[in-house]
């Protein structure tokens, strides 16, 4: 686990004074925005992204693509309403250096894109990014014919690295172990239509985490004209094939980020109140959609109406035994709610969270326990026994979901202070203001 950072700014997490009753407009999905940016950059014609998420991760992706030669114009949409980005594909060029920050989508999705550039593209990022695995993408690209230097600056299979683009990549079949991150599969699929032979990705490792994100990638590829064969469409298990061909420039509206709705739905559950999330899609591949079922099991009630998702807490919070392997990013928020429940919880299937922005399992265990909790790490998750909690400093380790988990606990526990709440800007800009507005208070 990354050491507690030495931030001095502490944010007093607001204590809920009663049941919340709010409508919260959640910004666009990071996962959808960054996939849409890559696909638009690789298209044969310009396209539009409506209601994109403007956050650190998405701005890093846009800046990286601009560095490589893609035109991205920020303004309003073709109909004159709402923010929209016009993406104008162009020949990708090096030499340039790309800052990935600590964004998994940027550090994993863009090396395959860089193989199509003329010239070297160097990738670097935050110190924590050096610890995150990239070997799946690097090894696969080498097997497909790419030249990559990842040994001159740091550890092999990690940042920093340089992709020596040759203007094209042969592509074809490749085997990878993506058990540590489904983004390895998505990264190859997104650029696959531009490879000379397309790409056939065969996963050879243990169970794949976060399968909804792969389904999201496949659906978005098909929406821009790519032909994709998948296990779900009658193909071989653990094999995805993308046929080479031109991608279409589309006018895409970005769904709200359902995972970022989690703290607000949790507030309704904890306070016995009601929160409405407008524009919740009826059908979606986003992992956050699982919150409807999970938080219902934990004591809430939800209804999808024309206004959006209406979620109501019952005043009781129940423990849960749940496999989160497909929706691991929801673990911090669920753990925070579970720490306030009336019975124990077991969260399973999330060993891969040890490789996320921080070691989320170790971080959650340490921070909840330091507030008086009783959390034990298991081989693939957490066991949480509710205890009476007390105030204290909740460290975030520069992890946005740790920050929102601390805010959730702070609703019911007095004097919780969040270290570096600004890290929420990674995917949820203005979180402190949104939180205060939901509670009907001035920003703390």
Regions from the language model: what does each represent?
Residues 1-444:
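Structural preference for solvent-exposed beta-strand-turn elements
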């Amino acid at each position: 686990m990354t050491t507690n950072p030495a931030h001095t700014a502490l944010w007093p997490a607001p204590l809920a004074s009663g049941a919340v009753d709010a409508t919260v407009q959640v910004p666009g999905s990071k996962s959808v925005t960054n996939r849409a940016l890559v696909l638009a950059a690789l298209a044969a014609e310009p396209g539009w992204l409506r209601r994109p998420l403007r956050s650190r991760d998405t701005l890093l992706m846009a800046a990286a693509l601009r560095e490589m030669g893609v035109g991205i114009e920020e303004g309003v949409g073709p109909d004159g309403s709402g923010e929209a980005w016009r993406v104008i594909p162009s020949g990708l060029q090096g030499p340039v250096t790309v800052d990935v920050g600590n964004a998994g989508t940027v550090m994993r999705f863009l090396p395959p894109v860089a193989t199509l550039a003329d010239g070297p593209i160097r990738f670097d990022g935050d110190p924590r990014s050096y610890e995150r695995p990239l070997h799946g993408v690097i090894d696969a690209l080498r097997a497909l014919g790419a030249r990559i230097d990842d040994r001159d600056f740091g550890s092999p299979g990690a940042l920093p690295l340089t992709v020596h683009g040759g203007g094209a990549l042969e592509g074809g079949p490749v085997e990878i172990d993506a058990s540590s991150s489904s983004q390895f599969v998505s990264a190859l699929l997104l650029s696959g239509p531009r490879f000379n032979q397309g790409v056939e990705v065969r996963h050879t490792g243990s169970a794949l985490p976060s399968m909804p994100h792969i389904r999201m990638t496949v659906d978005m590829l098909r929406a821009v004209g790519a032909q994709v064969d998948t296990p779900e469409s009658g193909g071989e298990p653990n094999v995805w094939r993308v046929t080479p061909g031109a991608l279409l420039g589309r006018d895409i509206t970005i769904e709200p980020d359902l995972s970022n709705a989690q703290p607000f739905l949790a507030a309704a559950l904890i306070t016995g109140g009601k929160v409405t999330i407008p524009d919740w899609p009826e059908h979606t591949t986003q992992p956050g959609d699982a919150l409807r079922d999970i938080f219902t099991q934990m004591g809430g009630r939800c209804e999808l109406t024309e206004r959006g998702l209406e979620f109501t807490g019952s005043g009781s919070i129940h423990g849960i035994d749940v496999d989160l392997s497909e929706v691991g990013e929801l673990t911090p928020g669920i753990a925070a709610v579970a720490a306030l429940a009336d019975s124990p919880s077991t969260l399973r299937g999330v060993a891969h969270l040890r490789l996320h922005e921080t070691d989320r399992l170790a971080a959650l265990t340490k921070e909840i326990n330091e507030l008086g909790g009783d959390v034990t790490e298991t081989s693939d998750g957490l066991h949480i026994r509710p205890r009476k909690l007390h105030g204290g400093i909740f460290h975030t380790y520069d992890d946005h979901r740790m920050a929102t988990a601390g805010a959730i606990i702070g609703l019911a526990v007095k004097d919780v202070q969040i270290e570096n709440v600004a890290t929420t800007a990674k995917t949820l800009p203005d979180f402190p203001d949104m939180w205060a507005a939901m509670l009907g208070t001035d920003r703390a």
